[in-house]
Amino acid sequence: PEGRQMMGTVDRLLKATEDIWASYHEKPFVQGLKYGTLDQKKFRSYIIQDYWYLMDYTKVFAIGVAKSKSVEVMKLFAKYIQAILDGEVNVHNGYMADFGITQEELDHTPIQQDNRSYTSYMLSVAYRGGEAEILTAIFSCAYSYEVIARKIVEECPSAPEHPMYGRWVRGYITPRYTGNNVILKDMLERLTKDYTEEQLRYLEEIFTACSRYEASFWDMADRFGTEGGVQA
């Protein structure tokens, strides 16, 4: 169809969720990261929850390996498992050392309901879907962190130098991280070039749900250390 040729899959997904994605930048937690005003208790609790999120996120890639129809896609998913465990989690490990978070504390910290709902949904999509559906769920998270970090730097150029939160900001705008997102995007475009309108609508549904879960995750993070939230 003519409209299909005019807009790639990723552009379509981003257009469908532009209001949700715009809301990320206004989240109090993200604003706190940007200006360095975030309560460290909230950030500490966020690091613990995000650690557990990443463990399940990695499992989504592992299901992708099992669902792969080509060696190329299999290698892509496998590469990301390593990239997440060696890359993103290393950012967390640094903060864990700073905050004195032990494996024992991690093991005894309950996973918050919003976090569990998000990863359960992603795992469900992965088990039910194929390569493109899995990539769609993954890309929502992976790319949103880059977009958020870039916007932070655009609005507060000194943010990457902040003694506490600068490392977080820098981690999501590194050439490795942003380069990996380009690879994900290109593969998603290739896998969906012959998708029907019905298939594309389903991807839109997945991407929208994951984007809403991302927004909820930032809201959850802002509740940490407050009454009714997780005490750091």
Set out the residue ranges of the language-model regions.
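Acidic, carboxylate-rich catalytic segments that either coordinate divalent cations
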Residues: 204-232
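A non-catalytic, amphipathic alpha-helix used as a structural packing/dimerization or gating element
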Residues: 45, 49-56, 79, 83, ...
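Active-site-proximal alpha-helical scaffolds that flank and shape metal-associated catalytic sites
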Residues: 12, 72-179, 208, 212
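Short, Lys/Arg-enriched N-terminal segments with co-localized hydrophobic residues
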Residues: 1-6
